[in-house]
Amino acid sequence: MALKDYAIEKEKVKKFLQEFYYENELGKKQFKYGTQLVHLAHREQVALYVDLDDIAEDDPELVDSICENAKRYSRLFGDVVQELLPEYKEKEVVNKDVLDVYIEHRLMMEQRSRDPGAVRNPQNQYPSELMRRFELYFRGPSSSKPRVIREVRADSVGKLLTVRGIVTRVSEVKPRMVVATYTCDQCGAETYQPIQSPTFMPLIMCPSQECQTNRSGGRLYLQTRGSKFVKFQEMKIQEHSDQVPVGNIPRSITVVLEGENTRIAQPGDHVSVTGIFLPVLRTGFQQMAQGLLSETYLEAHWIVKMTKSDDDVSGAGELSSEELKQIAEEDFYEKLAASIAPEIYGHEDVKKALLLLLVGGVDQSPQGMKIRGNIHICLMGDPGVAKSQLLSYIDRLAPRSQYTTGRGSSGVGLTAAVLRDSVSGELTLEGGALVLADQGVCCIDEFDKMAEADRTAIHEVMEQQTISIAKAGILTTLNARCSILAAANPAYGRYNPRRSLEQNVQLPAALLSRFDLLWLIQDRPDRDNDLRLAQHITYVHQHSRQPPAQFEPLDMKLMRRYIAMCHERQPTVPESLADYITAAYVEMRREARASKDATYTSARTLLAILRLSTALARLRMVDIVEKEDVNEAIRLMEMSKDSLLGEKGQTARTQRPADVIFATIRELVSRGRSVHFSEAEQRCISRGFTPAQFQAALDEYEELNVWQVNTSRTRITFV
């Protein structure tokens, strides 16, 4: 590769900044960087972002050179901008800061003491870092793909690259010294020391000509008002869980932020960072102990906070016609659900619920109050019913997920920990599992084994979707907009239907009510089911894959892409369904009161029905929730409640409408032998029965000669 002539490169840069333009809506030329240079000259703008896509239109070779040797070209661009600024300065700067006044005062004093026509002493020149009052950053070309953090190796040193990850730790913003200014106590001369490394050795002896000639040995004292500082922040980003090979620890990289790039991201944010990959330069005694190894960091130039759809690279792009044909079948809902953990036999309704958890409902924010759209599910059951297998599959399937166990998780491990920063010694926040799973799924196994003090940290996350921190003087709120999928075992080995739900699982009612679906998976002896399950397990062990089914399960990547497409939809509930949903909820409340239900049916149940309905509408890629979606949501809710009742409760819930109507009318005639027909009909309809069911019950018990109805049908009399 031929050596670059940087004088020619400098002319190219100058020409680009002066001449690059685009045509606006009126067809007039708009000089993009010329306008920004005017703002920089007048101090109306601090940072100049150079888009490499703009350079690629005229000179693709220059873009390659910048990407290969970004640090050198960053200084080159800075020098060119500094030279051009006086040409673009149209007026004097009104708002001057301390450094402006300091430099102007020094120049004025020096001019007074200098003879007329004399040339300024080059030793008194101010360093370019002190005079430069702007920041220059590159924005990477759109053609370059983001790298995985573990693929950033030694061959990337000095190059401009883009990495994606999740922010795990952010330090406080502090001032970093760029130029140190000293004053001599003997001759009064000023000395400037540009600082390039993280640490520096302050100057002690005055290097001026006067002190050296007189041998006065003047000592230098640091002038903080004349020194230049920039905002400095350090951030750690960790690679996403789907980028980590099985059995490996997630890699992380240190990102250094300066100036206008600070205070952009918080722990838990998913970011895309474009920057220069550099080694840490040690000086002084640290250089002697450094050895052959060097720490590295990314000098950030461009930071973008990403949404979930931006983050899922595989979700980008439309589905092909073949892929759409695979999904667009009549039973696509069943097919998608059965494609979740196909090696696990049965659990069809549980898999449907897990599919809806991945799709999620729609967030609502009426007048500032946030109603979550994420669906929470708790799987309970006897040991050996594949709860943990379902959790681990969802962890692999979800684009963003965190997997943890209750016994090995502390409260700070789930929410956020306050750690002391190794660089500055300051206290910093490091996000836990729930923060890192923001806009994803957090799978918590052995939920019942968690300590009570640690479990209380989840209450706020499940409803408010935030984590409030008040530790060691740090008061802040972090986002934790994640769905929680928990698995718990019964307290006494197996689920006892004679005990209440709280006694079986030993979880507080306040926490259980926050779950949209509580699913009990019991291991009941059944010859046919046991035979099919045993055949399924032996086949999986023999062939290391699931048995041949009636259909081919969908590929995991295809499911991820389809779920990402579903997230783009924002379905709404039409007014025509409002009364239907309300009546269904009232009926569920009535049934829960009549049958002494194991779970508490509250207003959260109604919100759960709405969330499940909107998730089903999203799954069908429509913008309006239909009655079938509501019915399926209610069916899943009923199935989850039925699973909690056990064999004893199954008969109680499946009581015939005629028998319930008979019991209702018998309550009305507790004082006498007859009751008004209209009163009985009104009472039964208010309890959710239809007039047809009421009439059928009347006819049935009249045939049995239990009661008689008079000819005018105004009175019911017991025989």
Curated annotation (Swiss-Prot):
GO cellular component terms, semicolon-separated: CMG complex; MCM complex; nucleus
Protein EC: 3.6.4.12
UniProt: ATP 2 binding residues: 514, 604
Molecular function via GO: ATP binding; ATP hydrolysis activity; DNA helicase activity; single-stranded DNA binding
GO BP, sorted A to Z: cell population proliferation; cellular response to epidermal growth factor stimulus; cellular response to xenobiotic stimulus; DNA damage response; DNA replication; DNA replication initiation; premeiotic DNA replication
N-acetylalanine sites (modified residues): 2
Residues with Phosphoserine modification: 314, 365, 500, 678
Descriptive protein name: DNA replication licensing factor MCM7
Organism: Mus musculus (Mouse)
